[in-house]
Amino acid sequence: MAAREILDSIGVGQKYCNEIIGKVHKIGNNLGLPGPAIADTLEGLEEDVYDETEVAVKYPLDVKGVDILLVTPSADFFAEPHVDGLIGYGKVFHEAGVSWTMSTKASEAGNFGMFIGSYENMRRVSLRIREAALELGVKRIVFGECGHAWRVAYSFLNTLAGPFDFLDPDYPVPQHICEFTLNEIEQGTLEFDKSENDDMSITFHDSCNVARASRMGDKAGGQFEIPRKVIKAVVNNYHDMEWDTIHERTFCCGGGGGLLTDDLMEVRVKGAKPRMTAFKNVMEEKGVTHLAAICAICKSQFTKVFPYYGMDMFQIVSVHQLVSNALVMNRKTPPEEAPGYGEDDDDE
């Protein structure tokens, strides 16, 4: 990281990463999605979830005085399988009965400042989260599925943007969405029908920024145990890949470190080979069909490189996509809370 920072400071940093950081500073997220576009996306998700479940799950934006600020990668607003994970977050919060919101100011969990080794850019991106939490008056911050975002949050957030002494001290700062979900599972507030995922047999990819550069939960190894416990709570068919290809021995997806650009596709395909080999082996030996991950870059990378290895792009799934599939929606909502209730569709 020090070498990258030196190169960036003399103007020879990674073009792709600097373009991404520029979008965050100018607009608020890596994809350059303005607030109205995010609001429109979330409104669409509410309608989709209601059509599927007849439950009015809310995906709130910029709501003050709620318990939780969810900070998630902007990929979750944009494409599969990311958006399926976002749908799952909302369903979990709904069933847990907690109040929450997302923020247009902090509409990006990712922090590409880390990839160019720039402390100043890491700090500026992180401060958006602090400012949003203060403005909205939340009690806790929960991060969505993003590997390097979790690394920055877990390892550096307090020194980059702290102190966070204005948050509720009863909760960790930050908290991962998998931690939140597992806690609700263990408390018995969530009910699942595992058979909803019986069309898949799952394995899990340990994203390197989570596996080797952070922790999760209150004990060592939680970053390995917690996501797997969540997965096993919602599926009937799960198998790990070979022991020397997972946990702290995991392989990079091939797209991390600022490589996630089509200009470097040849490098990305070659970089993915060790993980693809391990995945193919567990497919052949155990009948696994899908790979789950909790990293936006990993999911984006595998979506692109799977076809190069004879696999379907839809074989990569979000962990909270699996949660969403299996979650039984017991907290029913009255008709007047349905999206579009009271609107007159007739032309006048």
Where are the model-predicted features located?
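Short, flexible loop/turn elements at secondary-structure junctions
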Residues: 74, 178-181, 208, 295, ...
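Residues at the C-termini of beta-strands that transition into short coil/loop
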Residues: 104-106, 177-178, 206, 242, ...
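Active-site glycine-rich loop that binds ribose-phosphate moieties when present
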Residues: 123-129, 180-189
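Catalytic core of nucleotide-activated saccharide and alditol-phosphate transferases
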Residues: 142, 146, 170-185
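Local cysteine-cluster metal-coordination motifs and their immediate loop/turn environment
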Residues: 1, 72-77, 105-116, 120, ...
